């Protein structure tokens, strides 16, 4: 697990590097599907002092199998998403400013241009609010459940992120670094959407044919963006 712990450590260290976290407001995890184990950031440990060996390994029930620290308080959310979506290899949660602002406003991040369409096939959805019973019960598990409820049967890698109402963004990807990449993009397109709608409140969504072109040229079966 040492290699995966190093990858998760590096991905967590990317969060402050890209300006996605303040203090300890974020976490990254990755899963080893063959072993059924997840590596995740320890709860409340400062990035300045964190080391790869500080990463915590848990099984799919959340039991710590390796590590000296308690795992992230959001571990149950990560595990619920891994259980539901086999295509996920890494998950990120942050409170990045602009994506969190959309979450607090209770609004999906609208797909307004090609930057958005290069990564997200449609709006980045916002979940419903959790009930008092859901919050007082298994809060983190129920956060995962409301994300799944919102995504439905959609392919999660086609919309690799969501904003949880009154909470903040979660993003995911094929591995931890891919998930961080998508979290960075989500924050940028959230900022772009806010600015664009401030300039033109009547701004329409991106045309569907342009959305399809930009997403499919990067992610479709005949994708041709980048190098092989």
Swiss-Prot record:
Q: Which domain of life is it from?
A: Bacteria
SMART domains given for it?
Aldolase_II
Induction, per UniProt: Induced by L-ascorbate. Repressed by UlaR.
To which pathway does this protein belong?
A: Cofactor degradation; L-ascorbate degradation; D-xylulose 5-phosphate from L-ascorbate: step 4/4
Q: Which GO terms describe its molecular function?
A: aldehyde-lyase activity; L-ribulose-phosphate 4-epimerase activity; zinc ion binding
EC number in record: 5.1.3.4
Question: So where's the catalytic machinery, residue-wise?
Answer: 118 (proton donor/acceptor), 225 (proton donor/acceptor)
Binding-site residues for substrate, renumbered to this chain:
26-27, 43-44, 72-73
Cofactor info, note text: Binds 1 zinc ion per subunit.
InterPro entries from the xrefs?
A: Aldolase_class_II_sugar_metab, Aldolase_II/adducin_N, Aldolase_II/adducin_N_sf, UlaF
Q: Which CDD domains match?
A: Aldolase_II
Record-listed Zn(2+) binding positions: 74, 93, 95, 167
**Keyword vocabulary terms for this entry:** Carbohydrate metabolism, Isomerase, Metal-binding, Zinc
Briefly state the protein's biological role. Catalyzes the isomerization of L-ribulose 5-phosphate to D-xylulose 5-phosphate. Is involved in the anaerobic L-ascorbate utilization.
The family note in this entry says:
Belongs to the aldolase class II family. AraD/FucA subfamily.
Protein name as catalogued: L-ribulose-5-phosphate 4-epimerase UlaF
Q: Which organism is it from?
A: Shigella flexneri
